[in-house]
Amino acid sequence: MPVISIFLWCLSIITFLILGSLFLFVSLLIPPARLHGLGRIACRIVLLAAGQRVQLSGSFPPAKDGPHIYMFNHTSLLDNLVVITVLPELTSAIGKKEQFKIPIWGSILRRWGAIPIDRSCLSEAIESLNAVGRLFDDGHSLLIAPEGTRSTTGQLLPFKKGPFHLAVTHQVSVVPMVITGAYESKHKGSWQLR
């Protein structure tokens, strides 16, 4: 791994640990609805520390027209940070349960209101989907990668049925998002940051 990549990893991990810990502390003092702006700034700073730049093309529908299901292609470890920096509203997410066990990151996900899903246990997966339904009932939007996992090739994987079932069942609009360049920056199977 080139020296510059090692430097970027060290810088981004230290930045994440500091800002993640600060975010968790501040999240105890302010209501979750006000965390979105802080999260956007923190994610952008971590991405900058990793040598990444985020540029938004296009626009989102007004939050007042929601709730929405924001769906994005998942090709990189950086995707979640990228998406948070551009989303116009506080949005919950659904993610594999293993993410919630990662120190600091798992705590941030829980505080953010993310919902863990265990795809290996049907009853738990159904309960997670029911929790998403309650989010929609409360007017909250959802962020999800319909592929269910990161692509190892940079190409789209087949979509899972769950996100579309949620959209139809709850009559929620789908907002597609395309992330470009993240696969080239840090893809699954490589630890090199570019």
What are these model-predicted stretches?
Residues 104-106, 140-143, 152-194:
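A cross-family acyltransferase "interaction/gating" segment
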